[in-house]
Amino acid sequence: MSYKILSIILVIGTILAYITPETMPITAQTTSTVSNAANSYPISQNEWVEQQLQLLSPDERLGQLFMVAAYSNKDETHTNEISRLIQQYKIGGLIFFQGTANRQASLTNYYQSSSRVPLLITIDGEWGLNMRLSNTPAFPHQLTLGAIQDNGLIREMGSEIAAECKRLGIHVNFAPVVDINLNPNNPVIGDRSFGEDKYNVAQKAIAYMEGMENNGIMACAKHFPGHGDTDKDSHKTLPSVSHNIDQLHSIDLYPFQQLIARGVSGVMVAHLSVPAVDNTSLPNSNQTIPTTLSPKAIQQLLQQELGFSGLVYTDALNMKGVAGFYEPGVVDVKALLAGNDVLLFSENVPRAIEEIKKAIQRNEISQENIDQRVRKILKAKYRAGLHQYKPIDLNNIDTDLNNRNALLINQRLAENAITLVRDDNHQIPFGNLEQKRFASLSVDAPTLTDFQYALDRYAFFAHHTLKNSDPQANFDRKFNILKSYSHVIVSIHRTNKSASKDYGIDQKTQDLIRNLQSVTNVTVVIFGTPYSLQLFDKTPTLVMGYEDTHDFQSFAAQMLFGGISARGRLPVTASPYAVAGQGLLTTTPTRFKYTIPEDVGIQLGDLEQGIDRIMQEGMRTQAMPGGVILVAKDGKVIFEKFYGYHTYTSGKAVKTSDIYDLASVTKITCTVPCLMKMYDTGTFNTSARLKDYLPELANTNKGNLVARDILIHEAGLEAWIPFFEATLPAAIRSDAYRSQPDSVHYIPVAHNMYMSKPYYDMIWQRIADSKLSASGEYKYSDLGYFYWKKIIENYAHKTLDKFAEEQFYRPLGLSTIGFNPYKRFSIGRIPPSENDYEWRQQNVQGYVHDMGAAMLGGIGGHAGLFANANDLAVMMQMMLNGGYYGGRAFLNESTVRNFTSQQKQGSRRGLGFDKPEPNPNFKPSTSTKAPLTTFGHTGFTGTCTWADPQNKLLYVMLSNRTYPRKSNYKFINNNIRNRVQDAIYEAIERSKWYVKN
């Protein structure tokens, strides 16, 4: 029976077996079963291969050897040409280049539907699909991966890349590059290599390969026999490798041997002149034959000596490394005769097929040999699942590719790559922050960088920028400014790979850094090639950030301050002072890490969906104009998001860096920690009476009040006293206020509103004269905190704000927390708390909302503190850590445990801290899912913070629900704070990390 008749029969049978409702749109495709009237059964590899082979004439089988370049960003002319090659010449596969994922998927379906035998779809995706396709995840380049010590992360990356390839119908990824980059001036390999150490290269290549192969994508080791020690680009010419055969076996071939031993599916052969492998001269040239065209390189060395039996791919045949010596078609024949199975990127498929047919006629190669090559290709197609071909689902491709797992893997790779090259003065991670004045300088970034914004989370920074193109005068001015700071962190961006051009780092920049090093402490962080480290051999603190992306910039900053540990090691040698394998390891993290929920096993969707719904409801019902939510777990900030606007009418959007009035959260983030500090030193006793600290109260009804009773709100104090009413009406009481300060009116209560000193003194008398209710009954009161303020100030011999700043805020690196923020920040960063028509007759913005605290000059023991979400979270994390943060003990662990614990049966309160309500008959103070060990507080302005030791969980909510009127109780009545906390616990429950009591 002729092959044509057999082909017709097989096609008809295949179509009949294949037609189902799901597959009707696709024609002339293969099936996974062989069917007859009696039964159907799964088809074996050999059966399927022979079936497909018989579908093709001998001439058509030649087409299977070709893999043609396809683009998804070109026009219809290109698409039609590819379709013509598929239909007319039965080409075996496509290698996709630039374009988009959605377009490539559509084209793949179209091309597959045009092909009698399914096409093998491939891509150059060394750092993922993003190497060719826009808007897809970009993983780090291999040189960056060479710095990572945990190869399991690279295996995970390979698995994710495999999943993304499968989603796009790709079967082969031409990765990993296993070249050993021994030449810093290599123009084509460079950061595509894992580095210069053969063991490191091999181990990482194996991890990457196994990640793909174990998940159904065929890997391809390249560029055989090793393109690492070259100084020319084979795209443009024929590079030479001068290694002798022993060196090749010892170095260049080592990674190939290791991958072959572990079953790598493919090897790509490079266009290299390697006399030690084949010294046959090229015609009219003093160079030897390219390895792509050398039987000695492929059949003898690769297949016989190294034992490789998988698919052998040429490197692209349009590259000048071979195309510069032979005509199109001729070069294809020579590549085939050399032993290659797949001819990649042929310049002229029709001519190449004709030339191969001539070679068969000349008996240079047999049809049997061709058929064996085609069988290898078909077996690869079977292995790729093409015997069960299904078209690509075109729905949700972008979402599926840009998934949370890819983001998490990318972050972990960046985190583990950051390399602390040198730290001669033992500064990293930075400590004793209160003793340092920090400045940052970004070089050649267009604006303030993600690196600089990340630094802001850890300390107060003065940020500066310079560009290489700036005149020398600008550099001189920056020097005069920066030399006054104790620590300057210089980040270098937008570098290049050219050693002759100092990697894009201008001489002015190098001189500025050198001059700064002579007068202050300088840390240099380079987001570029590690070879550029040679320019900074005398920099005592040097960090390699590798890639100029958000993740690398963020984690470099985190490493400097102990948010993450330094783990990376240099993959290459830049100088005698920066050698391969060099990298300091720092201690375990001591400060917040900033990451994504998936880093602690929580899905962002689970967390965000519930929180967003409640916050949107709150804004829609005008329970609040906007706010910020922060969630930290296991010492990691996993969620920080802003919502809404500063007011209902302003149009000024909230930012996570905005500074809110904390109201009564002041108690547990200022006053109570100060009392705890005194408790640690033995100068405060919770069993003592007020008169022991304030003798002037001895003859009042307050003198015998016990500290513990005041802190748990059972001392009988009145809830509050409207002190401000004594100054009203302001229009009549002209003695009370002035618009400008003077010797009497100098207490600021609002913008251009200064209260007279006698009213300040009146406050203390009113409290002393106030009545007491029965002791032992719970009544929430602010009045005791007026006394705590005075007691702390008497002890410290300084104001409450200064003592808290000295003991906590500055050492913790908190840049926004404090009183009276209008003195330190632009008013635009501070959402207003109320349009106060009752007293101050103005928008209260940057001044404390609480009337009593305002009459104390904005510094109250019960209210007055402002902060952004991050600073508040750090303060609470310190207490969640048992008083420890940033490598430093701020409070004794036993003291924290004592103050944050429930103090007596029947009362939920800790010492100053609020806690979950244990009585189910009472209104919950927190989410009912919060364990009883949780501690925190709420604030009248719409704030709260809760720390849960059992789940190592921290929750911060900031809002200005009192704007424009404090009488708006929708926020409280709708239980916004607790419901957001519920949503957080529900997300944790779904992650199976939740602990209840």
Across the structure, where does each feature detected by a protein language model lie?
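Short, conserved catalytic-motif segment at the N-terminal edge
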Residues: 602-662, 683-685, 850, 966, ...
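Short, gly/Ser/Thr-rich active-site loops of penicillin-recognizing serine hydrolases
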Residues: 370-375, 379-387, 462-471, 571-578, ...
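Hydrophobic faces of well-ordered beta-strands that scaffold small-molecule active sites
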Residues: 63-70, 92-96, 119-125, 172-176, ...
